[in-house]
Amino acid sequence: MASVSTWSGIRNKLENDYLCPALRGHIQYFATSYSKSADHEGRAAIRMDGVEVLRSNYYIYFENVWTKFHHLRSTTLKDCDSAKEAIDQAHAFALEQGTFDQKVFYEAFGIFDNQSIEKSLVSENPLVRIFALLDRRLGKRRLLALEESMEQELDWVRAFYVIRMQAEGLMDRE
């Protein structure tokens, strides 16, 4: 697939090419970078009818990464060779906590856009799994078949499964 380099191109693909018909006009993807912040850091969100269901920003993400990194370096990964391992684990931990910045959001889209729906559904990256849950290529039967595995899913990812199930009329709205 061709690379999409602009936010408007990414948003267009997510909202028009990939998003299931039942959620079109309801789900909006948002990302921005702030020109006056160092390195143009920013935030990203997924909105449902204008309400941010999932949101995070660089500063929350950065705080979670560095807190976890310093914890790992002072406990289980003390030697110098483990610094890269510690930072990789810290980034993964922060993402599992539902924190990310717009760059992580863009990277997740890049992964999602360049692999099959099957791989996206089982991706290590929770944002990729969310994109897959909202994808038009995920049919109702397969959506229903995911119910058991969703019990083990992160709460903030499972919320998008519920949104999709309700939109498809497969689950009552609470």
Regions found by a protein language model. Give the residues of each.
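Alpha-helical scaffold segments
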Residues: 1-174
